Amino acid sequence: MAETFLSPIIEKLTELLIEEGFSLKGVRKEVKSLKDELEIIEPFLKDAEAKVEKDKGFDASKAWLRQIREEAKRIEDLVDDYVYRIEHHRYEGGFMGALRKACHCIKALKARYDIASEIQDIKESLHGIKDRGVGFGLRPLEQGSSSKPTNAERQDPRLRSLFMEEDEIVCIDDASGELMRMLIDGESMRSVISLVGQGGIGKTTLARKVYNDEVVKAHFDCHAWITVSQSYDMKNLLRIVSRQVRLPQRIIEEECTIDELISPLQQFLQTRRYVVVFDDVWQNDIWNVMKNALPNNNNGSRIIITTRNDNVAAVSKENSCDVVKRLQPWSLEMAWQLFCKKAFRNDQFEGRCPQELEQLSYDILCKCQGLPLVIATIAGVLSTKQKSEFEWKNVLNNLTSELEKTDIEKILSLSYFDLPHHLRRCYLYFGVFPEDYRIYDNKLYGLWIAEGFVKARSNKTLEEVAEEYLNELIQRNLVLLETKYGISRECRVHDLMYEIILTHAGEWRFCKSLKGGMSSLGERSSRLSVYGPTENVLKTVGDSRIRSVFLFGTNELSKSFVVGLSEKCKLLKVLDLSNAPLDNLPKEVGNLFHLRCLRLRRTKVKTLPKSIGKLRNLQTLDVSHTLVQELPVEINKLINLRHIFAYSKYGKSDFCLECYRGVKMNEGIGRLENLQILTRVEAYPGREVGFAKELQKLRNIRSLSILKVTAEMGIALGASIEKMDHLKELTLTLINEDEVLDLRCISSPPLFLRWLQLNCRMQQLPDWIPKLYNLRMLDLKFSRLVDEPLGSLKGLPNLLFLRLLQTYDGEELHFEEGGFRKLKELRLVKLEGLKVVKIDNGALPLLEKLEFGPFPLMMEPTSFDIQQLSSLKSLEILDMPREFVLGLQPDGGPYYWKIQHVPSVKFCYKYRVDRHDVYKLGSSELLRRLQAQGN
């Protein structure tokens, strides 16, 4: 039978029944009886869900489903509580342990009695619910009648279409060209451009496409993008603007009134040309405040506002230069292009509609009202269906019934209802985060796994299965993806889809938000997101069975809060305290037996309590950007750990090894054989070689970052890396710049390696690096290579990013014809002996971004063949000699012709470890600086 929300509960009971060594004495019969009862009820669920989706018998079916769901939660709580009470005695030892076990036997008898009694109560409740369902017409559906094969099951999840840029969702070239002209041309007076239209019309996508354009970036001195949404804090918005336009940090961080935040921002922008985007504005008062902070400085500054509210646009139009642009629904021709691109995306159809489906496709398209979000979403649903008239007619019929209600959100809900249940839970999880929240895919995988949403599959890790889940949500256009080189992936959902998520999450009590110190949670929910003060949270949760707690925007957090959570929420699986003002993690957190994910990112926690060793179910530990310097030895007991995040920096510069730090680990890391991610840890001080040898046991590792590597570790480290068959990301950082790390001993490198960062002196490039077929990002720092490396690296077929920082001491680099055919970004930094960079015609054909300098010996641009880079969009030149920079200026510079084809050219001069003065090509400020250097 197709899965339902009861399927995971039935599986859990089945596992409980068959697990060896688990004591069900006295209750096995009751557990099996309960499982059988759920299997009888499950066929009725499909009928009830179908009625809810089609709005037939809606209220009764929805109420019936809610009652079943509540009983399912009771069962889940019951099982977890029982497991905790039964297993708790397993780890006791010694005389006191024996005494405790004797006491525990008495408690175990009571636990069995309690569970038997609770099961009987649940069964009686389920009987009554089932009978009521039959009474109002629910019938068990036939096995397989509602089976919906998902795309993840049918196709390779690593489809090239999954890595499309967001702006490919809509074909907006004409509109973006018009908007760019409004930004760059026209009056010098400050102008406000309001993009108005209903949700899903493409306002944000249009604004983002133009905002990210290199020509626009080059035209303005300062840039800021602020997502406002319905919930906002004016002070926070002003701080975000200030931070993005690079106002000095001291001013931003001080406690200020609104007026005190406005004044320095206004002064800072008075002499600068700026572009600021306010996305998704709902209230008029935003503009009434912001117009005072953004001066009308006659420098050609521009402000873009996207809104669904006509009043917001009207209020912001204060002079003749201001523009209100109303976005219109798409023409049928434009809509057809997008529809086919999304619905027929695989290799068989290549974006073309089969003739037998053309009329039905047009009929479906006409129902989408010309809204690109609706078109993309419905096409995403169809992309997972068989390409048959029967399937197409079903979708058309559902669309027709929803459109009779003239509610776009109802139409978009079809894409939610089309999801199989395991994906519904994953999709609803975006509801625990704030609107427009961006989350990295690895974090999302860890949360889904911790919640038990990801089902194990043979020959695949849980993370790989979770990646398939996310990829299908992306393919269905339910999740928007922002990716850099296909490695670092940020996910978010459209604001309209977010509203749909909150609606369904609320109906099924999936998650709940507690905002502004609310004192009541209302109906019980499994997950709690706290926004702001926490003083009332413990009163609110009471003896709640909450499974996950997230904090957002919390300014005060007492130790007693975490202690209270540990005492009241015994079934907690996820505790995310990221960015909270937490100085100390209390030992009571060790009592959270079921905890699978603990995030302390960007807190001020200095040490972890030894009691953390009691968290035997912990899978994810995040202490990145904290003050933690060492993980306690008890960590090595946590054999279920899959992810350890522990990275930070002393400063923001990449120019010295001392800028990086990780956390120390005690001996025994080899016991953590389930580790998938380990970043960044330091080798055992004094036992570095032993640490390297222990790494051989981490056969499942996917991402590894090690600091304070020593030269002596080379052979042992190489042997360990060779055994890491699944490794995709590797970073090694040497303990200092004087030692030399020899990695040439590696003969069989991990075939799937796609990210390689080596922060170490090597002198000779290992010959295995050029063999890394899947490598996308290569970062070589402090290598001090004797031989020029480009001849070896040029053939890497999938390399997209290359940075050479203090990598080569020679005088010349030569990019040969046909080399680096896919490279998008190149950074050549601090190559102090470099005098010449040769670039053959046909080399670097796709290069879009180039950053180079300082090269103190390169005095004239004649030595750098920038003119060969025809695809270049962005050029940043760092701390180059005065003569070199003067030669490139448009007013009399003899080598301006070399860079005149590049849309964005900037010159950067470092004035602090992590700060640069940035000047545009030909600007008066740059020329004054160059003149001062010559005096």
Residue spans of the language-model regions?
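N-terminal amphipathic alpha-helical segments
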Residues: 1-60, 105, 336-339
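Surface-exposed helical/coil interface segments that assemble multiprotein signaling complexes
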Residues: 71, 78, 84-93, 101, ...
